[in-house]
């Protein structure tokens, strides 16, 4: 099934647009199991529900011209949860566990002074269809000397050292920086 609907004024048909709303922050991922590309994105409904917005949706493609919608993969949390609103993330496949891991930014709704405005969270899937959030994992910047409110957009890769690296955009002492977290198992950083 193709869900492609071009909005290109020159009718080139070069990009995907969902039937409802807009694509925000595409997160491309080559799926080594399926042999195709998955493009996860923040689904922007406009207007979005108050406080909870940007669930992660996805499409798959083999040629970047025809797309199959995979629908919603990772839902927003409740207003009380750290991921009431979801921000950009990154996906990686772990050959050892045969699991997909998507790390994303959890944006707290109306954070108090004691809350973290942003934190890194993750969900896993064995089939790229059904995702389970790891509710016990919340990586907080202030636990490592970084900002508790500017801690976002994780990017994951497996380094030449054989370890997983997660780069996080953040601030430290009022200056922008990229934090590099390292893990052997994608669970302990």
Describe the predicted segments one by one.
Residues 1-153, 158-189:
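Beta-rich carbohydrate-recognition and catalytic domains
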